[in-house]
């Protein structure tokens, strides 16, 4: 017990003595603060009228760029839609048939129903077909610029045609 007490007192005294020496020896006065550096950086950039890099205005929009953004967007929308559908099935009262009967009782026109079906099925078809395109790219096929544009147009046309066909069912 005495050994533990002696060890504790020795360490405590030694630590207090060394900490003051270490802190004083390594203390370096700061030349500028982070806020001053940040203000200097932004003043320099605004005075030279440089845009923040990479700036969106320097890029020319292309079909593959837009399709990549849309592929990500449809993926987020589809996963969000499936999650909302699952949560609503769990939390809302009644069953699926009662909600289907409610929609039928609204007497919506066929044009509105087909349009709604198209809006619901197009993101799924686009995301699926573009995903197949990406899988083909993963195999190392169709990576030349002309083939990328051709496959992009093909995906868009097939997505529209298949969505129209599925919405007509």
Swiss-Prot record:
Transit peptide: 1-29
The record's free-text note on cofactor binding: The heme b is bound between the two transmembrane subunits SDHC and SDHD.
Regions that span the bilayer: 63-92, 113-137, 145-166
SUPFAM superfamilies for the chain: Fumarate reductase respiratory complex transmembrane subunits
Pfam families linked to this entry: Sdh_cyt (PF01127)
Molecular function terms, GO-annotated: electron transfer activity; heme binding; metal ion binding
UniProtKB keywords: Electron transport, Heme, Iron, Membrane, Metal-binding, Mitochondrion, Mitochondrion inner membrane, Transit peptide, Transmembrane, Transmembrane helix, Transport, Tricarboxylic acid cycle
Ranges of the Mitochondrial matrix topological domain: 30-62, 138-144
Topology class, membrane: Multi-pass membrane protein
Localization, UniProt: Mitochondrion inner membrane
Metabolic or biological pathway, per its Swiss-Prot or TrEMBL entry: Carbohydrate metabolism; tricarboxylic acid cycle
Entry GO terms, CC: mitochondrial inner membrane; respiratory chain complex II (succinate dehydrogenase)
UniProt topological domain (Mitochondrial intermembrane) ranges: 93-112, 167-169
Sites where the protein binds heme b: 127
CDD domains in alphabetical order: SQR_TypeC_SdhC (cd03499)
Required co-factors: heme b
One BP annotation, GO: tricarboxylic acid cycle
Assembly, per entry: Component of complex II composed of four subunits: the flavoprotein (FP) SDHA, iron-sulfur protein (IP) SDHB, and a cytochrome b560 composed of SDHC and SDHD.
Role: Membrane-anchoring subunit of succinate dehydrogenase (SDH) that is involved in complex II of the mitochondrial electron transport chain and is responsible for transferring electrons from succinate to ubiquinone (coenzyme Q). SDH also oxidizes malate to the non-canonical enol form of oxaloacetate, enol-oxaloacetate. Enol-oxaloacetate, which is a potent inhibitor of the succinate dehydrogenase activity, is further isomerized into keto-oxaloacetate.
Membership in a protein family: Belongs to the cytochrome b560 family.
Protein name: Succinate dehydrogenase cytochrome b560 subunit, mitochondrial
Native organism: Cricetulus griseus
This protein's encoding gene: SDHC
């Amino acid at each position: 017990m005495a050994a533990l007490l002696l060890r504790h007192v020795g360490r405590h005294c030694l630590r207090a003595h060394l900490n003051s020496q270490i802190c004083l020896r390594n203390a370096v006065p700061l030349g500028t603060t982070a806020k001053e550096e940040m203000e200097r950086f932004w003043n320099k950039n605004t005075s030279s009228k440089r845009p923040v890099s990479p700036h969106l205005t320097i890029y020319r929009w292309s079909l593959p760029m837009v399709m990549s953004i849309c592929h990500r967007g449809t993926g987020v929308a589809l996963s969000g839609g499936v999650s909302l559908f699952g949560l609503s099935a769990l939390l809302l009262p009644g069953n699926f048939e009662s909600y289907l009967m409610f929609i039928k009782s609204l007497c919506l026109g066929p044009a509105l129903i087909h349009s709604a079906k198209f809006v619901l099925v197009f993101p799924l078809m686009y995301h699926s077909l573009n995903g197949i395109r990406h899988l083909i790219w993963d195999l190392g096929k169709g990576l030349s610029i002309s083939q990328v544009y051709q496959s992009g147009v093909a995906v868009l046309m097939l997505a529209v045609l298949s969505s129209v066909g599925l919405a007509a069912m």
